[in-house]
């Protein structure tokens, strides 16, 4: 248990959206809250979570726990991406391309939060279609998970890094 606490302290956590939702029943409406969060270590690990509860703090706590449980690693290249990528989830489409040092994170809303916690410092990004935060986060993570480093490509092709970079 102590290891989880220690691990949790060095993660960046961002709350993207809190939404009030309702369920209509015979006696009226039952309100609850949903929370969308992302966590990352700033060094290529990221996860997102979506929690739902009757109170806002409980929904945030649930989503943070889910985000910590669903983390995975992304190949980064000195604070940017190795190559341009596209991601898609339902109606949301995102495009991200590497940028020179000093550019910063040029992205909007939910996409910016994901890129900040994963550790990307320089990127040009654009979201197309639906800007629903949940779908944008999923599309961004889908795009980031498709990033391949030159070492990964070389290993898959059975070549050296120098031969594929020519």
Curated annotation (Swiss-Prot):
InterPro entries: Ribosomal_Su5_D2-typ_SF, Ribosomal_uS5, Ribosomal_uS5_bac-type, Ribosomal_uS5_C, Ribosomal_uS5_N, Ribosomal_uS5_N_CS, Ribsml_uS5_D2-typ_fold_subgr
Free-text function comment from the UniProt entry: With S4 and S12 plays an important role in translational accuracy. Located at the back of the 30S subunit body where it stabilizes the conformation of the head with respect to the body.
GO cellular component, as recorded: small ribosomal subunit
A Gene Ontology biological process term: translation
PROSITE patterns: RIBOSOMAL_S5, S5_DSRBD
PANTHER family membership: MITOCHONDRIAL RIBOSOMAL PROTEIN S5 (PTHR48277:SF1)
Name the record gives this protein: Small ribosomal subunit protein uS5
Gene3D superfamilies with a match to the protein in the record: 3.30.160.20, 3.30.230.10
Cell membrane in keyword set: no
UniProt GO molecular function: rRNA binding; structural constituent of ribosome
Subunit relationships: Part of the 30S ribosomal subunit. Contacts proteins S4 and S8.
Domain S5 DRBM per the UniProt entry, residue ranges: 11-74
Keyword Ligase: no
Family: Belongs to the universal ribosomal protein uS5 family.
Domain notes: The N-terminal domain interacts with the head of the 30S subunit; the C-terminal domain interacts with the body and contacts protein S4. The interaction surface between S4 and S5 is involved in control of translational fidelity.
Species per Swiss-Prot/TrEMBL record: Aliivibrio fischeri (strain ATCC 700601 / ES114) (Vibrio fischeri)
The entry's keywords: Ribonucleoprotein, Ribosomal protein, RNA-binding, rRNA-binding
